[in-house]
Design a protein with these regions (language model features):
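N-terminal, motif-rich segments that launch catalysis or mediate targeting to/interaction with membranes
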Residues: 1-101, 119-201, 206-214, 221, ...
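Short alpha-helix carrying the canonical HExxH Zn2+-binding catalytic motif
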Residues: 99-107, 111
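C-terminal ends of transmembrane alpha-helices
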Residues: 113-119
Length: 304
């Protein structure tokens, strides 16, 4: 891929939501795939902003889950479908910036259920959820290497051809990830991970999640392609030379942003660990997303 792509992936992207959305662009296929890739890379700020908006702006946390063992409780498929429609409308109008933003938002709802902890709910998971996500973010480069070197590379992923194709795709992601839910709980080492997040995950976790990363990236690429086809417009040619220069100049700023976010993650995990050691549970220091999902799950599933 291009220098610009590498700069985005390795320096600008601060979360796995960012990385998966950008990685999907490299897997695009079709006659106009290079144009679409370059266009969305040029609109990377909107794409990455959208990819985190469900967490930072909308905070509609029920839409971030799909619990396969509870009759597919959660709103991820419907949320993804809503933002697919917005993406297609924006592309039809040639509003490339908003189209990229919508693509980022949609990607969040698609890939969240491919994280096993977004497919179920247990007390044990709540204790380590934030720590596991921190560890998986920090070990992404290693898991990417495992995918390419040991697991056969990017997988073949296909979409259904009916009206519910996107909802079925989101459900397929949850079905693929949920079998690893218990493995993450049993194998994650909180004592190690709270200090050095890369050490919290063992080889089996890394191998399984590497496969999920591959599925998520290619699934997103196929979804983007379907949206491009539905929009039925030709993307403009763009030159990324100036954009590459600007991103390169901003690398120090991006690294500072990464360091700040890492410090915030560490503080969150440390607080949860301290509460767990003191009380045997995690309640007061749960993240807002976990608190909301836990409350809604109790009201809508456990008490139903």
């Amino acid at each position: 891929m291009s220098v610009f792509f590498d700069l985005l992936l390795n320096t600008v992207c601060r979360s796995n939501h960012h990385r998966l959305a950008v990685e999907a662009l490299a897997q695009l296929q079709g006659n106009d795939s290079e144009r679409w890739r370059d266009l969305f890379l040029q609109q990377y700020e909107a794409l990455l902003e959208g990819a985190k908006a469900p967490d930072t702006v909308f905070k509609d946390f029920k839409n971030h889950v799909l619990h396969t063992r509870d009759n597919y409780w959660g709103g991820a498929p419907e949320a993804a479908e809503e933002w697919r429609k917005r993406m297609v409308r924006a592309l039809k109008d040639r509003d490339w910036k908003y189209g990229a933003y919508c693509a980022g938002v949609m990607s969040h709802y698609v890939v969240d259920p491919i994280q096993p902890f977004h497919t179920g709910q247990t007390e044990e998971e709540g204790v380590i959820h934030a720590a596991v996500e921190w560890s998986l973010s920090k070990t992404y480069p290693e898991m990417r290497k495992i995918l390419l070197a040991d697991l056969g590379g990017w997988p073949d992923v296909r979409l259904a051809d009916d009206a519910d194709w996107l909802k079925k795709a989101v459900r397929a992601g949850a079905d693929r990830s949920n079998p690893h839910y218990d493995l993450l709980i049993q194998h994650y080492n909180l004592e190690l991970g709270r200090k050095k997040p890369e050490q919290g995950v063992d080889q089996e976790i890394k191998d399984k999640v590497a496969g999920l990363i591959g599925f998520a990236v290619v699934l997103l690429a196929r979804i983007f392609e379907r949206c491009f086809a539905e929009a039925a417009v030709q993307p403009p040619r763009v030159n990324l030379a100036v954009d590459t220069l600007l991103v390169g100049l901003n690398v120090p700023v991006a690294m500072v942003a990464k360091a700040i976010e890492n410090a915030q993650d560490r503080a969150q995990v440390t607080a949860m660990y301290q509460e767990f050691r003191k009380t045997g549970k995690v309640r007061q220091t749960l993240r807002d997303d976990d608190k909301e999902v836990r409350a809604l799950y109790a009201a809508e599933v456990l008490k139903a």
